[in-house]
């Protein structure tokens, strides 16, 4: 039975494909009794190309794999030192629309960074979160059966050079920035703790239940 809580899954470091397939399975098998979950993960290096992605935005992938995925948006990079958060939410049950969900996610990142005196903002025409015109967080969602999957990536303390091999989110010359440069959270763990607080507040869900690892049936 749905327990009106937000279940937080701490996945640690995982390859992209296994987590992607697990969240597809979770979403496909949901019903009205399924829990709302947020998965927190750090991925091994990978470029993911969204449904709107164009191959010309992948400039020089080199030895980093490129995976075509079923989320919105263009190409982005995931790697160690980046916080990735996947909200697996029944937005119909929560009575919020897709645009509202995007706004809640963006605002939760902005509110979290404000705790570190970092002035961040969203853009109406380019999803994500920015600081001084440089992108600190990327966003790409998919809605299926009224439920969300995929999510956000926040640059914390990572090797930023792979972003130079692509046009991030389809924008040539898009500059990326990370928390470490700005005096923000210095570790993925710290960023995850802070962001879960602000995201759960934005969603109006204050009962949190923490778990380690993927659901047993998807491991």
Swiss-Prot record:
Pfam families: LplA-B_cat. The active site is at 169 (acyl-thioester intermediate). This is Octanoyltransferase. One of its GO terms (biological process) is protein modification process. NCBIfam families: lipB (TIGR00214), PRK14342.1 (NF010922). GO terms for cellular component: cytoplasm. HAMAP family: LipB. InterPro entries: aa-tRNA-synth_II/BPL/LPL, BPL_LPL_catalytic, Octanoyltransferase, Octanoyltransferase_CS. It catalyses: octanoyl-[ACP] + L-lysyl-[protein] = N(6)-octanoyl-L-lysyl-[protein] + holo-[ACP] + H(+). Its EC number is 2.3.1.181. Residues 32-207 form the BPL/LPL catalytic domain. In the reaction, the free carboxyl group of octanoic acid is attached via an amide linkage to the epsilon-amino group of a specific lysine residue of lipoyl domains of lipoate-dependent enzymes. It is found in: Cytoplasm. Keywords: Acyltransferase, Cytoplasm, Transferase. Belongs to the LipB family. Substrate binds at residues 71-78, 138-140, 151-153. The record marks 135 as: Lowers pKa of active site Cys.
């Amino acid at each position: 039975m749905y327990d009106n809580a937000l279940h937080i899954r701490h996945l640690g470091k995982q390859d992209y494909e296994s987590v992607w397939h697990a969240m597809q399975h979770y979403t496909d098998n949901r019903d009205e009794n399924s829990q709302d979950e947020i998965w927190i993960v750090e991925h091994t290096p990978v470029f993911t190309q969204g449904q709107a992605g164009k191959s010309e935005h992948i400039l020089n992938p080199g030895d980093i794999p490129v995976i075509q995925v079923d989320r919105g948006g263009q190409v982005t990079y995931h790697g160690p030192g980046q916080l990735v958060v996947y909200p697996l939410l029944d937005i119909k049950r929560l009575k919020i629309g897709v645009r509202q969900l995007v706004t809640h996610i963006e605002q939760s990142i902005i509110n979290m960074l404000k705790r570190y005196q970092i002035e961040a903002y969203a853009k109406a025409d380019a999803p994500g979160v920015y600081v001084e015109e440089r992108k600190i967080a990327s966003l790409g969602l998919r809605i299926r059966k009224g439920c969300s999957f995929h999510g956000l990536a926040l640059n914390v303390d990572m090797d930023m050079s792979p972003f130079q091999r692509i046009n991030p989110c389809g924008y040539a010359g898009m500059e990326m920035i990370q928390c470490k440069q700005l005096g923000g959270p210095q570790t993925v763990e710290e960023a995850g703790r802070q962001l879960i607080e602000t995201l759960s507040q934005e969603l109006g869900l204050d009962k949190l239940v923490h778990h380690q690892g993927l659901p047993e049936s998807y491991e």
